[in-house]
Each structure stands twice: as C-alpha cells, then as structure tokens.
C-alpha cells in the first residue's frame, strides 16, 4: 500500500511541476491564427473523431486531438482556467493552451496512464 501511495504522491508532484511549467509560458505565445485544417462549414474539422476536441499548444501552436474525457480531469481543468485567463474564450485562435509543448505532452502521457488504487 505504501508503494502505491508513494507512486501517487510522485505522480501528483510531477503533475504540479508540469502545470507550473505550463503557466510559465505566459504571453510568449503568438496571437496569429492560421487554421489550415479542413472544415465543414462552422462545424468541427473533418479529421476530429466524435468524442474528441482540438487544442493548440505552445508557441508554434501544435494541434492535438484529445478525448472529451480529459475535460473532466482536474489537471486539465487547471489548464483550461489558465487558457481562459491568458486568452479568454472569445477569440479566433481556437482553444489555445498556454503551455510549452514538452510539458503538455508529459501531462497528457500521465493522464493516459491507468490509475491503480
């Protein structure tokens, strides 16, 4: 049991560090937006499967397609709060996460790992 708790503590610490690095990106992100993906009118891009959504991450605005289940995860909700504070949600840039891509990849990888209790 102690090993599991220690593992959870380590994962929690890692997630906190990742979120801290994400928030440090700040206003370094570009405010330009070029959406080069195919769209069907005002709907989602055609390459986004049902049950997924798109976010843009980092200074180069790398596009990620994520499962909607991430929206309920507290660590992802913190990123959304940072995005709202940084950019608001009323802009033409798509959902942009103010986070370095390396830190974001690390967070997503940890979120995809099964949780053992």
Curated annotation (Swiss-Prot):
Pfam family, one: Auxin_inducible
Top-level taxon in the UniProt lineage: Eukaryota
Alphabetical list of InterPro entries matching this protein: SAUR_fam (IPR003676)
Disulfide bonding pattern of the chain: none
Location of the protein in the cell: Cell membrane
Tissue specificity of this protein: Expressed in trichomes. Hardly observed in leaves.
Conditions for induction: Repressed by abscisic acid.
Entry keyword set: Cell membrane, Developmental protein, Growth regulation, Membrane
GO cellular component: plasma membrane
A biological-process GO annotation: response to abscisic acid
First-listed, main subcellular location of the protein, grouped into a coarse class: membrane
Membrane topology type: Peripheral membrane protein
Family of the protein in this entry: Belongs to the ARG7 family.
Task of the protein: Provide a mechanistic link between auxin and plasma membrane H(+)-ATPases (PM H(+)-ATPases, e.g. AHA1 and AHA2), and triggers PM H(+)-ATPases activity by promoting phosphorylation of their C-terminal autoinhibitory domain as a result of PP2C-D subfamily of type 2C phosphatases inhibition, thus leading to the acidification of the apoplast and the facilitation of solutes and water uptake to drive cell expansion. Triggers plant growth probably by promoting cell elongation. Regulates branch angles and bending.
Protein name stated in the entry: Protein SMALL AUXIN UP-REGULATED RNA 54
Organism: Arabidopsis thaliana
